[in-house]
Regions:
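N-terminal secretory signal peptides
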Residues: 1-19, 44
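Intrinsically disordered, low-complexity segments
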Residues: 2, 7-10, 24-29, 33
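Intrinsically disordered, low-complexity segments enriched in polar/charged small residues
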Residues: 13-14, 25-26, 31, 443, ...
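N-terminal twin-arginine translocation
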Residues: 16-25, 33-48
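Hydrophobic alpha-helical bundle signature of multipass membrane enzymes
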Residues: 38, 44-556
Length: 557
């Protein structure tokens, strides 16, 4: 990875493009004169000792201010959507708990024991819940106390859409359509019949909250993200396609563990129930043997199954550093010549910030998952739809739109069931859907990157995958010369978050609301970190809602 440049070339920030030697000569300062200033006895280490008591007082004030910011107004109310009370045991997360072998519903006593254990929030109670082969994933993560940013329990998320409302139905219909469109190349969307049918039905739904163009859903915007940049350029962000120089290595972004086309799971009720009971298939799936660039929804789903927590954003940071993308104008080293931003505000800080914020984001969203919302996974709701339409159970509280959906009917024609087809054999992870871990981390990490880099910087030479994903070809769209760092970072976050929707394991609001949660977490972390730097600085960027924000650090002596 190249050393990050302050603007373009390190010496280019000096007056009239002078290099350092010319700059010193212009000031009349010779190398010898510079050396003579360091007379014996003047540069002893003793002269550089700091007042330890003063520094301790500064540190104590900093920690006190940070703690006050993190924990003030800690008594925050966290409402959920009320389904747990209104429709007990039916529409909340229950995967890996014991289920009735006929109805597919959770055993009530098991659910009550699970809720009681969460309220006690200790290891012994959680260990005695009784689950299948797959354990519940880390309920106590959301109880961790942060030492940077704000307390996890001060962040709020709105209640998730309810099963008896149009928005919930629209989100499920979108997932059925995504299952039907998984193997269609993004570059073929405009002319594909199924994609056009999907856009048409989604456009007709009053509860659909995805992007629209001129009030309609079209192939140009269907299944894309909701924020700035998501509708510009190719479907896939450049940060998921272009090669990345990472230290002494070059990362070629072909997938080597991708699910093959046409392979869906959990389309049979017995298989579905087997997975809901917490079981798992012993054998790994057969992956596509040909390395491919991301070209369709199944490829995106494959990426977000194998990715590490902040992999995509660390890669994006490395790409931006290698490309010498311009830093944010508030970076204190933006126009300095004698000192550089090697640690503070430079490559090391940027890379570490992506890691730092990702853990804060994950812990915060796990509090929302387990202790507030406990939203059902889409695959679980698919079981309710199947049982209702086949007449095995009566769930008349489900909003009619999804029960009468063209997408649901097409899935039945293909598979002989109304279950939501899954990309992964085991379906979702064993933790609730809302908020989404991938989406919260995405929102947090791209916010950090937008804070450090100039969002308006143009991404050069955009590319797309060819038809079989084996190579990259130039993107030739009309906007090929106007794709920005800010837009492509937002798109990267959408690709990762909605990639989980392509797999069938998350909802659209899991993406949208979690992105904004992640953004809040990143902002608070940046504000806390701003107090620790001696340099006066600022970060300016655009929030997901389109509003500008500036975070300032006053510095200290």
């Amino acid at each position: 990875m190249k050393k990050q440049k302050k603007n373009k070339q390190e010496d280019s920030v000096l007056p009239k493009q002078l290099n350092r030697r010319q700059f010193l000569e212009k000031l009349g300062i010779s190398a010898a004169a510079g050396i003579s200033l360091l007379s014996p006895g003047k540069a002893r280490a003793d002269n550089f000792r700091f007042n330890e008591a003063s520094r301790a007082r500064k540190g104590d004030r900093l920690h006190s201010r940070a703690a006050a910011r993190a924990y003030r107004s800690a008594n925050v109310k966290h409402p959920n959507n009320g389904e747990e009370d209104d429709f007990p045991y039916l529409f909340n997360y229950t995967k890996s708990l014991p289920h009735d072998s006929t109805t597919g519903e959770v055993v009530p006593r098991a659910y009550d024991r699970y809720i009681a254990a969460l309220k006690k929030n200790n290891f012994d109670a959680l260990e005695n819940i009784g689950t299948g082969f797959r354990p519940l994933e880390n309920p106590q993560a959301g109880l961790a106390l942060p030492i940077s940013g704000m307390d996890h329990q001060r962040y709020k998320m709105p209640p998730a859409p309810r099963v008896d409302k149009a928005q919930h139905s629209a989100e499920m219909i979108e997932l059925y359509w995504q299952a039907l469109c998984r193997d269609i190349n993004f570059t073929d969307f405009d002319d594909d019949v199924t994609v056009n049918e999907a856009a048409s039905e989604l456009s007709s739904l009053s509860g659909y909250a995805g992007p629209r163009i001129n009030s309609s859903v079209s192939p140009a915007c269907v299944f894309r993200g909701n924020f700035f940049g998501d509708l510009s350029g190719p479907f896939v962000s450049q940060f998921l396609l272009q090669d990345i120089s990472f230290g002494a290595h070059t990362i070629v972004q072909r997938l080597t563990r991708a699910y093959p086309s046409g392979t869906d799971y959990m389309t049979d009720f017995d298989d579905w129930l087997f997975i809901q009971q917490g079981n798992n298939f012993k054998n790994d799936p057969d992956y596509d043997s040909t390395p491919r660039y991301i070209r369709n929804g199944r490829d995106l789903a494959s990426y977000v199954y194998e990715d590490e927590l902040y992999q995509a954003y660390l890669n994006a940071a490395a790409w931006l550093l290698e490309e010498e993308a311009i830093l944010d104008s508030g970076n204190p080293y933006h126009r300095l010549a004698a000192t550089s931003n090697y640690v503070n505000f430079g490559p090391k800080r940027i890379l570490c910030s992506v890691s730092d914020v990702s853990m804060l984001a994950l812990q915060a969203v796990f509090f929302q998952k387990w202790f507030v919302h406990r939203r059902q996974r889409p695959e679980e709701f698919g079981g309710r739809i199947h049982q209702h339409i086949t007449g095995a159970r009566d769930y008349s509280m489900i909003h009619d739109d999804v029960l009468n959906s063209e997408a649901v009917a097409k899935v039945f024609t293909n598979n002989g069931s109304y279950l939501l087809p899954q990309v992964y054999r085991q379906g979702s992870p064993t933790h609730p859907a809302y908020g989404a871990g991938h989406a919260t981390v995405a929102g947090a990490c791209v916010t950090v990157l937008k804070a450090f880099f100039d969002e308006t910087y143009i991404v050069k030479n955009p590319v797309v995958a060819n038809s079989d994903g084996t190579a990259l070809v130039p993107y030739t769209g009309a906007d090929k010369n106007s794709l920005t760092v800010g837009g492509e970072l937002n798109k990267l976050a959408a690709n990762i978050a909605i990639g989980r929707n392509w797999a069938g394991i998350h909802w659209r609001t899991d993406y949208t609301e979690s992105m904004e949660l992640g953004e809040k977490i990143a902002i608070q972390m940046l504000r806390t970190q701003a107090m620790q730097y001696p340099e006066r600085h600022s970060f300016s960027f655009t929030r997901f809602n389109g509003s500008p924000i500036t975070i300032r650090g006053r510095g200290f002596k």
